[in-house]
Regions:
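Membrane-helix boundary connector in multi-pass membrane proteins
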Residues: 312-343
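Juxtamembrane interface at the cytosolic side of transmembrane helices
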Residues: 224-262
Length: 357
């Protein structure tokens, strides 16, 4: 048991240590940019789509001497985009003095320029007389596997240096081409997640699946079909003692069905990530040993939890089985992201109901 717990802690730590917080900014303007808070203490993955006339405005607070890292990536669809950065002291930033390129690359071509003439007029006006430079996201590199959200990204360019001052820095993402760009901008390198970040992760992870090129219908369809198959199979294998244990208490009977549906959602979460992993494998067959992290955290454990509830749980069963079911629900609440929050919460409430009855 201690070995299993240690394995869970190890894989969870590995998952979070190789990750950044995904965010999808709403519509922004030069006067109302999207703020990336505490970028020296927290890393972000900024996702979205960028048309030829679109501009995404971002803002971050720099701390003098702390790492300043910006990394440009895209989805599988071939595209380019540029990132203008301006603020105090940027004339002293060279972006590439360590030959750093993206999250995982170390090559000399860092695609850095101080020529602002190709930027849209609105961006040049916003920059004014501020010190600035532009990162060109037009690199051609092999895809990298991201185990946290189970996806692939294609590095395009980047900047690694230190903030020259404690000040506000602005960024503008622009698209110099006609093709729509599905961008992923990494900002910061410190992995940090709040309680709320983990609770709301299912909804941004779902959006990253769609961002990667899958349709929303396919993502939801696989989840719903997996839940239906699991629940239908449970109904087909009902044992009489499942109902003998609850007698004529309709509330407990209904709650037991709710728990089976929740277990189906745990199973569906594992299947959803498995399908996503297979798609990654078809593009990049060598995902490296880091693939063990999503296999364990996002696929194996949720499916195991689902079948443990399937085979072992009874409303009036032993207390340690109920405690295990609550622990499984808590795990899925924070790490079973394709169980969409509501199903882990419901599973915990159902088990607590059975415990007090």
């Amino acid at each position: 048991m201690h070995g299993l717990f240690s394995s869970v802690v190890f894989f969870l730590s590995a998952s979070l240590a190789a990750s950044h917080l995904p965010v999808f900014p709403p519509a922004t303007t030069a006067s109302s940019p999207y703020e990336l808070a505490s970028v020296t203490e927290k890393s972000y993955g900024v996702y979205g789509e960028l048309g030829q006339t679109d501009i995404v405005w971002l803002e971050m607070q720099g701390v003098k001497g702390e790492d300043m890292t910006v990394s440009l990536q895209r989805s599988e669809k071939r595209a380019v985009y540029d990132v203008a950065i301006w603020g105090k002291g940027l004339d002293n930033v060279t972006c590439g003095n360590k030959n750093w390129y993206g999250w995982a690359h170390s090559v000399g071509g860092h695609y850095f320029t101080r020529n602002l003439t190709e930027l849209p007029a609105a961006v040049r006006d916003a920059i004014g007389s501020s010190e600035a430079f532009v990162l060109h996201g037009d690199g051609v590199e092999s895809p990298e596997f991201e185990p946290f959200g189970v996806g692939l990204y294609w590095p395009l360019g980047g900047c690694k240096d230190t903030f020259p001052a404690t000040a506000t820095y602005r960024m503008a993402l622009v698209n110099p081409k006609e093709e729509l760009a599905a961008y992923s901008l990494g900002v910061g390198m410190v992995e940090s997640f709040s309680f709320t970040d983990l609770l709301l992760m299912p909804f941004v992870i779902y959006r990253t699946f769609v961002w990667s090129g899958r349709s929303a219908e396919a993502v939801i369809g696989i989840f719903a079909l997996s839940v239906l198959i699991f629940y239908a199979f449970r109904l087909m294998t009902l044992q009489r003692n499942s109902y003998a244990a609850v007698g004529n208490q309709s509330l407990l009977t209904v709650s037991l069905h709710v728990l089976w549906v929740c277990a189906g959602a745990f199973f569906a979460s594992g299947v959803s990530f498995l399908f996503q992993l297979i798609l990654c494998f078809t593009v990049k067959p060598d995902l490296g040993t880091i693939v063990l992290v999503p296999l364990f955290v996002h696929i194996l454990l949720p499916i195991i939890f689902a079948f443990l509830i399937f085979f072992l749980y009874q409303p009036y069963g032993r207390w340690w089985i109920k405690l295990g079911a609550i622990a499984a629900g808590a795990y899925m609440l924070f790490f079973g992201w394709m169980a969409f929050l509501i199903f882990p919460v419901l599973s915990i409430l159902v088990v607590l109901l059975h415990w007090v009855r």
